[in-house]
Amino acid sequence: MAGHTVVQRALPNIASGSFAQSASKTSSHTSKTSYSAVVTPPSSDGNPNVWRANHLPDGLIYIIVGGTAAAIFAFIILWYAVARYMSRRVAKKTMYETNIQWRDTPSSGLYDHGDEKELYQSLVDHSDKNDARPKKSLIGLLGGGNGLGSSTSYDTVADADMDDDLIGGGYQERFNPVQDFVPSHFPRSSLFISPTLEVAQQNQQSKSVGRTNHFQNLSVTSLPSASESSSNLLDRPERTASPERKPKAYGRYHQRNRSSVGVSDHSHSRSHSRSKSASSFEMPNVNNNNKKHGTTPSRFLNNLLEGNDDGTT
């Protein structure tokens, strides 16, 4: 080991050689320099092609669109509120006028709906225009033979118009939709017969007839003609018992009980005449019966005491 020698070589230094000099030269030549570009917009002064928006706020377009939508929405709400208020006001006014007309019209409760009201109103207008009563029907519906629409003594009185004014125009002829006159201007294309119209007229005429009878009893009464009496007899319904029998039994009951309560003057006169006739015819019958059956025991004893031996008077 002692005889061997070690030879060491040093590595070449890069920085100290020619290679280091060449590297420094290339790095100095590859460096670059950067510059920033500055753009200046043209001024709007004296230039008509540039919009002058320096004094306007940002987002002006969005503000305009939002304001337009809000205005349309507010207009719709305002229109709905005004229309609702006007409709409610018109409805209240119409209801008030309808109530006033219903209170002023006395016969508005009879015909409230449907074609019956229009038919009745057209007939009333036509009768007022021509100043004549409608033609009386030959047949009446729902018991037309009760004599409500028949002629009475009221039609023959000379001052009937004055009584009609006092009554209030309650006299009305019955209307038959089948035979009575219907105005041509009323569009009626069916053969429908309304029973409610007949019933309402029947009730109204019964009330009016009751009022007219009161005035007829106070005023002049006249006898009906032969035709009227025959028609009344035909229209009169059949009776189960004769009314002439009832006053006789009623008078006999009070006469038997010796009571004058509830007996009219006519019944008193009839009962008085019957009592006279009965007394005049009953006395001979009693004498005849006594003769037939003989004298009574009390009468026979009286005759014996008086001296009559045969026991006869």
UniProtKB/Swiss-Prot annotation:
What membrane topology is annotated for this entry? Single-pass membrane protein
Q: Where is the composition biased (Basic and acidic residues)?
A: 235-247
Establish whether keyword Membrane is in the entry.
yes
Which InterPro entries would you find in this protein's record? PRM
| Segments of skewed composition (Polar residues) | 285-301
Example of a GO cellular component annotation carried by this entry: cellular bud neck
| Record field: transmembrane | 59-79
Q: Where is this region: Disordered?
A: 22-48, 221-313
Q: Where is the composition biased (Basic residues)?
A: 248-257
Biased composition range(s): Low complexity: 22-37, 221-234
Where are the annotated coiled coils located? none
Annotated compartments = Vacuole membrane
UniProtKB keywords:
Membrane, Transmembrane, Transmembrane helix, Vacuole
The UniProt family comment states: Belongs to the PRM5 family.
Protein name per UniProt: Vacuolar membrane protein ZYRO0A01628g
Native source organism of the sequence: Zygosaccharomyces rouxii (strain ATCC 2623 / CBS 732 / NBRC 1130 / NCYC 568 / NRRL Y-229)
For this protein's source organism, the top of the classification is:
Eukaryota, Fungi, Dikarya, Ascomycota, Saccharomycotina
